[in-house]
Amino acid sequence: MYVTVEPGVTWLELYETLKPLGLRTPFWGPFSGKVSTVGGSMSFHALSHGTNNAVSADSLLSLQVVLGNGDVIETGSQGKGSQTSRFFRYYGPDIGGFFLGDSGALGIKTRISLKLKKYPEGFAACSFGFPDFEHLFQAMRDVAKLGVVSDNHGLDPRKQKTAIMEMENTNP
């Protein structure tokens, strides 16, 4: 299953369209929120909020791109001459990767096809504390192995505090 969108579609618009159908994309959207566009996420190789499906490119099946000379190309299994549907990104050499994280410098994305998966039957959030990073990492690894969690976050308060102090010292 896949969905094809124009690059100006926001993650919120896509979410609201797909949810009534019981579907979603593996990548939920970047840190900048639901108002971010799908095209922007691909152009800046956006990261999401957790450990699974955390990179926008992981949901990509194909791109339609207009090159600087005006040529229009299709990547993935929908590439030129292919009579197949958009089912697989890595059809031959993955030239789609050239246009991920390029900030639009290598071409203008005009159509983006993304994988779809079933929307989860349930949703819950919880928070835990750990005595140190090693225990946090072990717990995250064990949960990820179960395959039942879509996102798994972890923060080390000491590292966060250090990062904030460094930012304050370099940006007074």
Identify the role of each PLM range.
Residues 1:
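Glycine-rich N-terminal segment of FAD-binding domains in flavoprotein oxidoreductases
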Residues 128-132, 137-172:
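C-terminal substrate-recognition/cap domain of FAD-linked oxidoreductases
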